[in-house]
Amino acid sequence: MPKAILLFTVCIHHFIGCDLERIYRELEEQFPEITFLRCYMDPIMQKHGPTPDQKLRKAMYESLDSEPDKMDTKQISILGSDFALDQSSDLKELLPKAGYTVRELQSCRTWEEYKELGNAGTFLCCYPSGKYGIELLAKRLDRTFLYLPLSFDYEEIKKEEEILWNTLKPEDNQ
């Protein structure tokens, strides 16, 4: 059995009046060992609010949780992007030097590694479409959230690094 299923409903389910909450409830009762992630493909119903891409990224992290005693203030989960940051990126080089463990969804090979993302003391997002979902995740788990969009402008990079270090307050500020 899979550990999780991303279940996509589409606009036709809304048009015909499906009771989606009942469907999810019954699936969860029949298969308690599986996490059913609620994903939507409803661009026709999209009038305002988050885009379908933002909703998908939010759904991908809704099963992350953490017990308060498992929160690791020295772990940073970088989430929300389609691709892992390059090993030579400033964040991937500087954070470990300051004593932080950096985790990303793209490096998770097991469900357990995925769930470990939720133990981070800080959730960092660099990708605009991921901001909505990661910000809600940080709020739900009462964690620090940082949005530091990727930039090629040196002044912007310097400003974002200042925000990063002022938020984290490491002992040995890089």
Regions of interest found by a model, annotated:
Residues 1-174:
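An N-terminal assembly and electron-transfer interface module characteristic of large anaerobic redox
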